[in-house]
A protein has these predicted regions:
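Hydrophobic alpha-helical transmembrane segments of multi-pass integral membrane proteins
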Residues: 1-172
Length: 172
């Protein structure tokens, strides 16, 4: 239902941010279907992470409409998101796909640090500043988790796998 609703929203409002949100919903649908079909947990975790990253990324992209961002940079975010979904879905089957997912998580974090409105609202006061600082700290954790995965692929069950998952799922 969630993926269908997200696709319906994207069809009604065909914008990059709604497309990225729909990709996140698709990642969740595929991950849950794979788990229900008997795939091992570690095979679906990359798709769950993609859901998480794409959903937050899509929401932040929507808020970035308030800032002037070059069309090419917006399209770059869309391309990163699309390939992130693909690499996450393939991570259980294709050697190197998890490394690519990590690299794309790092690229997502770099894009957000460069283009998110939080880079401007961090200069505000009170709650606005607190939220901006929290978001920027989360992007650092996303970059760290992505870098760990990109550097070594982090085999499920290893200490590096745990470190990458904690960095992304707790830090981000």
């Amino acid at each position: 239902i969630f993926a269908g609703a997200s696709l319906s929203i994207w069809r009604r409002q065909p914008a990059l941010q709604t497309g990225v949100l729909a990709l996140g919903a698709l990642a969740l649908l595929v991950a849950n279907a794979a788990l229900s079909a008997g795939r091992p947990l570690e095979a679906v975790v990359p798709s769950w992470i993609a859901f998480f990253v794409l959903t937050i990324g899509g929401e932040r992209l929507e808020l970035s409409r308030l800032m002037p961002i070059a069309r090419t940079m917006r399209l770059a975010f869309g391309a990163i998101s699309f390939v992130l979904l693909g690499s996450a879905l393939c991570a259980a089957f294709v050697p190197g796909a998890l490394r690519l997912s990590g690299l794309l998580m790092f690229a997502t974090a770099a894009w957000l640090v460069r283009h998110d409105i939080a880079t401007r609202t961090v200069r505000a006061a009170g709650l606005t500043r607190y939220i901006a600082l929290s978001l920027l700290a989360g992007y650092v954790w996303l970059a760290l988790g992505g870098a760990v995965l990109a550097a070594n692929g982090a085999a499920p069950g290893s200490g590096l796998w745990d470190a990458a998952l904690h960095a992304v799922l707790v830090g981000f």
